[in-house]
Amino acid sequence: MAKVVKVSFGWRIPEFPVNGQPVGQEFITQVLKSLETVEGEFDSAWLSDHVIPWASWQNPSTDNLEGWSALNYFMGMFKRLSFGHVVLCNSFRNPGLLAKMAATLSVLSSGRFILGIGAGWKGDEYNSYGYDFEGFR
């Protein structure tokens, strides 16, 4: 007999308006309406961890949501979704502190936080906040 495997689907939360407008209440309302629509239909929702827009077509001075704070905000409102980042940049936060933050959020959300960590790749993003960027090795 074949083993049944559950497939999970996640929805990517935009962290900046694609029209270049500032992040404001109108944008947040659109995101909240989208999350209301996907809750119960998708298993998870995901945000990126960028301090400036990641998209090469987007003006780097475009306002965007900071991923950790925004994820905590949305997670508190939508109890039937798991949440995670695609992905957290390992050099934006001290590793020990990040582990504590992730463990705390996991406990507070009854295990709905999904931790994903990546290397970071956007040199101009590092430079804009004064972080060291050595590139890939």
Q: Positions of the model-derived regions?
A:
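Structural motif corresponding to the early beta-alpha repeats
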Residues: N72, G76, S82-N94
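Glycine-rich, flexible loop/turn motifs
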Residues: N64, M77, L88, K122-Y129
